[in-house]
């Protein structure tokens, strides 16, 4: 996810984003035919932050500042699923931002959704469960100093892994809920200015994550006892990487580069190419999903504050996000 920045950082970020606007469309190679599926209402806080795929190809989406989760069909139709309880002060104590927002999203096989909530209050911040047709219930508490962000489920163990962007920690908690365990800390998770650990995925027995401030993608093996193995740096030089998705079972990665207003394809050797830019319709991308030859990109427009949207493009690489 991405945030409203301090003035100095905002100016620099705006300049970086503006630089992409003068280039030709970057939809190249495996990515083609980009088009906007859905425009959102910025003034209503409808800023799409994270996404989980339904079996039929529909998208479950967190609307960050609105504190909502909704379903979006492949034709752009919308259905509100749940609204998280709003803090009385609007989340004024939320770290870095100063307002509350819904963040990472995970869907289990029975249709239950798990959503991260950074609210600036001990009684609200943490992980919330939304059963089909039900109301949100907090299952794991984090302190007001936490910024739960990207999240993924290890289906082998039933554990959720949560990237905490301000406390520089990867938390682990069972689906049933409970007290989160600090699974991983270390220098690779440090933040220098805004956000540290951000996007998070489970892939082939390892936790993968982005560190936005450090511009890296990291791989952390999970050993047979569930402990974190040595942290491996898989890619560097990325401009504020946010959420990402694997192309099928490979180690090719599509990643949202929020401040650059770009989407990149990262190869297994760590090299990357830009495949989408602002000229294709991006508005500060925060998350991506891959399904049935389609690449979906969520843009929350946190810095641009213009046109939050969901963009879809054709992808000739693989079937579904992992």
Which residue stretches match the model-derived regions?
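Hydrophobic alpha-helical segments and helix pairs
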Residues: 126-175
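Short loop/turn segments immediately following the C-termini of beta-strands
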Residues: 64, 118-120, 165-166, 212-213, ...
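A short beta-strand motif characteristic of beta-propeller blades
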Residues: 34-42, 78-95, 135-141, 179-191, ...
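Glycine/small-residue-rich hydrophobic helix-like segments
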Residues: 214-283
